[in-house]
Amino acid sequence: MSFDTTQSQSGVSVSLAVFVGLVLALFGSPLLGQLDIADRFSTTTTGSMLINSVSMWALVAAVFVVVRFWERRPLGSIGLEMPTRRQAAVGVGAGLGGLVLGMLATGIAVAAFSLEQPETLSTIAELSLPVKLAIVATGVITEEFLWRGYPIERLTELTGSLWIGGATSFIVFLAVHFPAWGIVGAIPQAVFALALVGVYLRTRNVVACILTHTVINVVMVLVLPAFL
């Protein structure tokens, strides 16, 4: 059942379900952050990060519920399908290319402006390997549903423009991550976000984006901190 509230110029009705889904996907993480759940239930860095990971999975579950039981649509409508070999290759290739460009841009900025590495990266480097793996798995999967698959597809339907969906995803993703990563972290994050949005616009497949994000996060979270 659809609860229509208004009508976009593209002729697609905006339902309450889609509105709720967009709020959950795009802004659910920072809204939960305002509740300080991690700090309330844990006094350690490891505990806080694991609680944050659980929160991200809960948001994805909520979005899935909206799609399947409120919108009554398949998860394929937000890009959850097995990728073709070409789509998988695009995902992996974009991850490698994004890494090279992101680290190059960061290196130039650090050298030019004497910037320091983000505190978040130093904090992650001190965690145990199992916790790092949990953080990587959470990030590469949940963030692609929340900031790529759902919002890009639904905003494209509402506006009639795939580019508006992609641009919104890019801007919100950067804004949400900026407080944790700061200026120096925002440089590679911008490159990575462009790569991830580009992969989704090209493939319309969230699994391809997960492959891109996996390549990036494995290097940035598991490999790079060991050399810093």
What are these regions (language model features)?
Residues 62, 71, 101, 105, ...:
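Hydrophobic/aromatic residues in alpha-helical transmembrane segments
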Residues 37-51, 73-139, 157:
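Juxtamembrane helix-loop-helix connectors linking adjacent transmembrane helices
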Residues 70, 80, 198-201:
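Structural motif
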